[in-house]
């Protein structure tokens, strides 16, 4: 774990629970794509920098989930590097309580204000194509989270962030966290057509060909949508959520309630907007039915 692996040319990644990209910029200058899950991950990254005599100039965050920005604060304090995050992700990176607030749907209790859902705050600037290193391409990858992006480096290495879950993860859990199901499916259709020297997803193995895994994610997402639609039998949201937990053999906890609850609501929004389910008020309860 935390091994530095060369993808191609000056494009590397650090093998970790959420992969960290590292790209040489010329001379001793390097930048990162994301920073890992916490301060300890930041220290592991710093060890690679020191061992190679590299100077960190910037961190380009793909999105603001805690496991991708957790090393930001430590590395920024240690190196003075700039940090960039896209769109609404910039706000969450600077004000990290927004992530558990969004997931929970209100002021989050202390039990949700932990490093898994709420990273340390860092000073991030808005990420645009203009601030990227020369030869890079900014790749919009919405769906998993608010304004997630990926990057294509000058070595033709594509860093795909969280737009793909591994087969192992999907086979084990059946359903993955999503913010916007429709945008996610559209993103995966675009990813299927991409070509690169190497694709580096954050939570799946690096691969030269990404289309098979993208299609597997599409299939499992559509299966989850159909399963959730089938649970809408004139029941409340909590009953739908309980049905999802039971169907996938998951264990209820407060963090899982926030993560999966948010995901199920996103699926319900997707299904409602497609006219496949409807919500009606009955006896002071909101009831979900398949149309």
Predicted regions: what is each one?
Residues 1-52, 150-162:
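Conserved beta-strand hairpin/beta-sheet module of binuclear metal-dependent hydrolase folds
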Residues 10, 23, 34, 49, ...:
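Divalent metal-coordination and catalytic microenvironments
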Residues 11, 40-132:
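Active-site HxH/HxHxD metal-binding segment of metal-dependent hydrolases
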Residues 14-16, 132, 141-145:
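A short catalytic or substrate-binding loop motif that flags glycine-/basic-rich loops and adjacent residues
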Residues 227-291:
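C-terminal regulatory/interaction regions
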Residues 8-13, 35-38, 59-62, 136-141, ...:
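Short, flexible loop segments at the rims of nucleotide/cofactor-binding pockets, characterized by
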Residues 37, 137-223:
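Metallo-beta-lactamase
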């Amino acid at each position: 774990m935390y091994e530095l692996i060369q993808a191609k040319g000056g494009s590397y990644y650090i093998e970790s629970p959420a992969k960290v990209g590292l790209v040489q910029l010329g001379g001793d200058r390097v930048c990162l794509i994301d920073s890992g899950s916490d301060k300890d991950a930041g220290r592991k990254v710093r060890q690679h920098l020191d061992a190679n005599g590299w100077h960190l100039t910037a961190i380009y965050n793909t999105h603001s989930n805690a496991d991708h920005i957790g090393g930001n604060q430590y590395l920024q304090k240690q190196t003075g590097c700039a940090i960039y995050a896209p769109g609404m992700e910039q706000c969450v990176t600077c004000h990290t309580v927004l992530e558990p607030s969004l997931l929970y749907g209100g002021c989050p209790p202390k039990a949700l204000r932990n490093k898994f859902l709420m990273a340390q705050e860092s000073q991030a600037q808005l990420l645009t194509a203009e601030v990227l290193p020369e030869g890079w391409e900014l790749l919009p990858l919405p769906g998993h989270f608010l304004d997630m992006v990926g990057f294509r480096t000058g070595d033709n290495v594509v860093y795909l962030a969280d737009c793909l879950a591994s087969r192992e993860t999907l086979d084990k859990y059946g359903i993955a966290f999503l913010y916007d199901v429709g945008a996610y499916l559209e993103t995966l259709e675009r990813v299927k057509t991409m070509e690169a020297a190497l694709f580096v997803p954050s939570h799946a193995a690096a691969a030269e060909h990404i289309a098979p895994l993208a299609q597997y994610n599409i299939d499992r997402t559509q299966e989850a949508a159909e399963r959730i639609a089938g649970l809408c039998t004139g029941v409340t949201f909590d009953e739908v959520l309980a049905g999802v937990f039971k169907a996938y053999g998951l264990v209820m906890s407060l963090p899982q309630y926030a993560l999966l609850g948010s995901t199920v609501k996103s699926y319900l929004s997707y299904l409602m907007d497609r006219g496949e389910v409807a919500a009606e008020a009955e006896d002071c309860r909101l009831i979900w039915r398949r149309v």
